[in-house]
């Protein structure tokens, strides 16, 4: 294996192993920031040694052993003599690992026994509500996604120093607030889980419909969010909304190839070539949706949105779509989590089921909603309805307004093209 091949292997190992490595270390040292530093130290050692010695049989255990030994050395060097660190130092000293194949195999088995609980703790800490939404997203992608600061910055079109500052501030806040490395108690589990799901779906949505930049989609973010969702579903198998979110992301991701034209232009749902949809992802999404439904209880917002996505997925042509069922699902979603955006989406479904005038009446009733004042999809939807009603001049004005409100270049180009197609 060449040095280049080894470095590629190390990158792949790091992306897979870093979340459980950081999670295991965080449990040991009780500090997420220190845990990441130790994991990075282990990575540096691997980069130095593996090109000569080769990638070990149990790379995750090797990295954990190296990181634990590094923790002992760091504690000694910093002379942390208070009782807590003395106890921690003795605990780690008792666990000091000689990096041999036998010890790595033993450690790998031990990690497998504890990795689920540790990962779940890391998920909840990374998405803790004491952090801002931006910090939660950045920290989650860094600690659980294995992304570098540069990769996160590139994905969100944000300067790298900005992302670095968010991550540093997040780790400092967790330490200052003494956020425990634990799974929340039952009384607060629902609220904390909602925060986790929000972060994962924010990551997915930024990949699925980029809010800014020159690309309409950033598939890498969708893949990162899907991977995090699948991991969470394995760790919390009895939480229906987790399976609902996974179902929603799987089904939406299935359309990725069909959503973008050969020149990068957006292709709207009803215009997509459904033969290009990924039916493996659809089947996985339907399985996850069934799992959410089997667990019972009130359907949450993610499960309901997944059920709506499933209506589209089950229709082999746009004409086969059961729009009445979609309207009914939006009715339920509006009762469960009322919001102007849900009402706007419901109005779109009503327009297909009952005609554009019925939809326009609903959309016009939303025109005064403060939450939609600068939301580009409101004039975009209204423009589409006005066009169908033959009110072309008004439609052109609405498409132009929508174009002025979006920060995505592809979306803007599509809206301006729709406006220009109406003359004037």
Where are these regions (language model features)?
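A short, charge-rich alpha-helical start-of-domain segment used by transcription regulators
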Residues: 2-23, 33-36, 190-198, 202
């Amino acid at each position: 294996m060449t040095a280049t091949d080894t470095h590629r292997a190390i990158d792949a190992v790091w992306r897979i192993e870093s979340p459980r490595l950081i999670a295991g270390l965080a449990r040991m040292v009780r500090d997420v920031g220190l845990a990441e530093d130790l994991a990075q130290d282990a990575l540096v050692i691997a980069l130095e040694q593996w090109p000569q010695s080769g990638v070990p049989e149990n790379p995750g255990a090797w990295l954990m052993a190296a990181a634990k030994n590094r923790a002992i050395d760091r504690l000694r060097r910093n002379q942390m003599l208070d009782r807590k660190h003395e106890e921690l130092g003795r605990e780690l000293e008792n666990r000091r690992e000689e990096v041999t194949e036998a010890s790595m195999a033993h450690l790998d088995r031990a990690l497998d026994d504890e990795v689920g609980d540790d990962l779940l703790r890391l998920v909840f800490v990374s998405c803790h509500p004491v952090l801002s939404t931006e910090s939660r997203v950045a920290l989650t992608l860094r600690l659980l996604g294995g992304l570098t600061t540069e990769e996160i910055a590139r994905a969100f079109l944000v300067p790298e120093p900005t992302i670095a500052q968010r991550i540093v501030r997040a780790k400092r806040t967790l330490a200052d607030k003494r956020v425990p490395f634990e799974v929340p108690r039952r009384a607060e589990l629902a609220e904390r889980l909602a925060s986790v799901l929000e972060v994962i779906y924010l990551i997915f949505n930024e990949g699925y419909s980029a809010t800014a930049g020159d690309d309409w989609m950033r598939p890498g973010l969708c893949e990162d969010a899907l991977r995090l969702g699948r991991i969470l579903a394995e760790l919390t198998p009895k939480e229906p909304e987790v399976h609902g979110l996974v179902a929603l992301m799987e089904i939406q991701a299935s359309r990725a190839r069909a959503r973008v034209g050969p020149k990068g232009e957006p292709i709207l749902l009803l215009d997509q070539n459904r033969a290009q949809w990924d039916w493996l992802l659809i089947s996985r999404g339907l399985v996850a949706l069934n799992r959410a439904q089997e667990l019972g209880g009130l359907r949450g917002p993610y499960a309901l949105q997944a059920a709506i996505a499933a209506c589209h997925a089950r229709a082999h042509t746009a004409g086969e779509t059961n729009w009445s069922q979609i309207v009914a699902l939006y009715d339920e979603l509006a009762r469960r989590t009322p919001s102007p955006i849900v009402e706007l989406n419901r109005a779109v479904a009503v327009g297909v089921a009952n005609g554009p005038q019925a939809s326009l009446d609903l959309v016009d009733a939303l025109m005064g909603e403060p939450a939609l004042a600068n939301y580009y999809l409101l004039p975009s939807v209204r423009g589409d309805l006005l066009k169908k009603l033959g009110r072309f001049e008004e439609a052109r004005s609405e498409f132009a307004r929508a174009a002025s409100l979006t920060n995505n270049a592809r979306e803007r180009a599509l809206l301006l093209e729709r406006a220009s197609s109406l003359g004037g």
